[in-house]
């Protein structure tokens, strides 16, 4: 991304909400205009620029051109993580032996690798430099960073799937959630492995690139847990990951329903929470807006992809209103940008932030 855009995002992400800007306060606050940021990746980018998804994954020059184009087309949007080298959900699970089905015009499907909890005992933390798709990502990052820099742009953030998301792909989502209750010890061992995997993969990306200042962790499965199960099976592992990257901007994405987990999530060490439209922005702001920055939460499919520009502006205005005029808000979708999202609706989001 452009340095100016990154510095603007980082400044807001790391700023400490002052007493005057806290929810419920009436004091004045000197603040910047609302920043627009969007998580974008292979479900949206190839279709938007008019190339097959397989070309996007396999032809590095097409990948570079596509990412440069969206940045130039929407100069006021901070795209996260920005120039994201990914293969759908496949990078981390592939290192555990998960097979993948590839499609011409959509991201690959991941097939679970283990079918009994007894198989967890044989799993080891993979080497990002050698196992699965991770080494390909690392090698490509070194290649593409030079091309990105020639465009006076920069790769400032890297991403990884969270420990529960990776575990659920290795085991199967339903099976993983059942294991939480029936085989808690084996499940915790799996989560220890996937937690260390996320840490090592993020560190490897940081080491292969030259300018990284932020991490993005994505894990929707966390929202499927009760508060009690969250504290046992998610909170320690999330906290371990975020605490491993001191000095980095830490963004967490979860667009499942997490209104029952807002307070403990805010204590994991994250700076920015991107959450779904199924959580009320005003409630989230009142409860944790004094601790973290909120990023959201326009309905993705119904409004950002399928609505009119006027509907996008209306929902954006509500997000701004519900956060006291945009205090602590990074205006965004309630999740990643979905397929078929038109340019006019992203333009409308930017216009709403401007006003």
Where are these regions (language model features)?
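Membrane helical hairpin/interfacial module
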Residues: 67-92
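Active-site loop segments of alpha/beta catalytic cores
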Residues: 1-56, 63-66, 80-81, 102-109, ...
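A contiguous, low-structure linker/loop signature
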Residues: 84-126
């Amino acid at each position: 991304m452009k340095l100016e855009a990154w510095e603007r995002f980082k400044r807001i992400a790391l700023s400490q909400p002052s007493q005057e800007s806290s929810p419920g306060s009436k004091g004045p606050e000197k603040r910047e205009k609302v920043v627009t940021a969007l998580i974008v990746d292979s479900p949206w980018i190839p279709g938007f620029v008019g190339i097959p998804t397989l070309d996007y994954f396999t032809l590095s020059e097409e990948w570079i051109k596509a990412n440069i184009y969206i940045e130039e087309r929407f100069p006021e949007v901070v795209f996260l993580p920005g120039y994201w080298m990914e293969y759908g959900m496949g990078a981390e699970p592939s290192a555990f032996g998960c097979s993948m089905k590839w499609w011409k015009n959509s991201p690959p499907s991941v097939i679970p690798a283990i079918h009994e909890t007894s198989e967890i005992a044989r799993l080891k933390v993979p080497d990002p430099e050698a196992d699965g798709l991770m080494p390909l990502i690392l090698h490509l990052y070194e290649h593409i960073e030079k091309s990105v820099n020639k465009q006076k742009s920069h790769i400032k953030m890297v991403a990884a799937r969270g420990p529960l998301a990776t575990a659920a792909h290795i085991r199967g989502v339903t099976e993983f959630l059942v294991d939480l209750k029936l085989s808690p010890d084996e499940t915790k061992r799996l989560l220890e492995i996937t937690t260390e995997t996320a840490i090592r993969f993020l560190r490897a990306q940081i080491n292969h690139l030259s300018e990284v200042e932020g991490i993005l962790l994505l894990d929707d499965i966390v929202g499927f847990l009760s508060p009690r199960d969250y504290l046992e099976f998610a909170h320690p592992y999330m906290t371990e990951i975020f605490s491993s990257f001191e000095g980095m901007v830490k963004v967490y994405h979860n667009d499942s329903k997490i209104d029952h987990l807002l307070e403990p999530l805010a204590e994991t060490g994250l700076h920015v929470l991107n959450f779904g439209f199924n959580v009320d922005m005003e409630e989230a702001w009142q409860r944790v807006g004094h601790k973290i920055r909120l990023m959201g939460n326009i309905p993705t499919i119904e409004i950002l992809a399928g609505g009119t520009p006027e509907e996008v502006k209306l929902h954006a205005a509500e997000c701004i209103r519900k956060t006291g005029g945009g205090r602590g808000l990074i205006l965004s979708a309630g999740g990643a940008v979905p397929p078929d999202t038109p340019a006019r609706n992203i333009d409308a989001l930017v216009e709403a932030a401007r006003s």
